[in-house]
Amino acid sequence: MRPSAPPSSMTSHGLLRRRAVALALVAAPALWLGARAQPAPGLRATPAQTEGPFYPVVFPEDSDYDLLRNGALNYPEGQGAWLEGSVSDLAGRPVAGAQVEIWQCDHSGHYHHPGEGARADRRFQGFGRVTVAADGRYRFRTIRPVPYSGRTPHIHVKVRQGARELLTTQVYVADDPGNPRDFLWRSLGAADRAALTVAFAPGGDGLRASFPIVVAA
């Protein structure tokens, strides 16, 4: 028969084992969360750009996803287009509940803004805001942006989460001849141009443009 270990030795080994298990249980979630927080391969934050001078001072009563319908008024000008995509963080997780805003000029190049007087077409909503779905998706119905003096076609985009502003940027039209002459588009590096320049391709119910947004949420 083997002699039993001294009681003090058994107690010491038992305490050490219990401590090791407890430490492992505490460390495991932290390690898992740390791994989850790491950027997904190939993901980089969407480049920021200036807000510009025409962010709305007064938001329209109708501020939904459809910029081609302002209240009871329909906007028949320009090329109808859908701008859609997703909002995710650097780990690729949807930023559910975030708000995406867009604003742009009408087909004649005028914004709904005091600096433009009353020249903007009141049938064009000009500004829209949507809340990102659980899967991170968002969608707007608008027009293909048009140029105006000094600027190539673009749409302004802002992303918020509660009181936090996560991103302000601009979206450009791929292959537009005005891009190389635009001072803001020219200021972008190759990777940033690729991230902010999207194709407006023909679809069944208008042009379609996909603009994925990645933020450091």
Model-derived regions, located:
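Polar low-complexity intrinsically disordered regions
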Residues: M1-S12, A37-P39, G52, T152
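N-terminal secretory signal peptides and thylakoid transit peptides that target proteins
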Residues: R2-P29
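Beta-strand-dominated extracellular/periplasmic modules and repeats
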Residues: Q38-T197, P202-A217
